[in-house]
Amino acid sequence: MRKNNILLDDAKIYTNKLYLLLIDRKDDAGYGDICDVLFQVSKKLDSTKNVEALINRLVNYIRITASTNRIKFSKDEEAVIIELGVIGQKAGLNGQYMADFSDKSQFYSIFER
């Protein structure tokens, strides 16, 4: 149980840190979508059963969106994304089969706008 709490705490720290690093550029192509998803994920972290899978989907979404919009991250931003990737790797292939990583709606429930 303690291990899961550490992962949850780390995930919260890194998602918030990345959000704060990127929020100033939210009006640039792709950054707004990434910031929206980071905010959504940070809200869902406490209620999700599988933190690793959620973070894994987040990192995949960030990578696809960055590639599509030709976003170059700074060293600090990239370091945080790598730390999130380490957390996400613990999920293995859980939830990746036939997934659309570029779909932002995977982070929203049907009752949210």
Curated annotation (Swiss-Prot):
InterPro entries, A to Z: LciA_Immunity-like, Ta0600-like_sf
GO BP term, example: bacteriocin immunity
Pfam assignment, any one: EntA_Immun
Top-rank taxon: Bacteria
Alphabetized UniProt keyword annotations: Bacteriocin immunity, Plasmid
Family: Belongs to the immunity protein EntA family.
Function: Imparts immunity to leucocin-A to naturally sensitive host strains.
Protein's UniProt name: Probable leucocin-A immunity protein
Organism: Leuconostoc gelidum
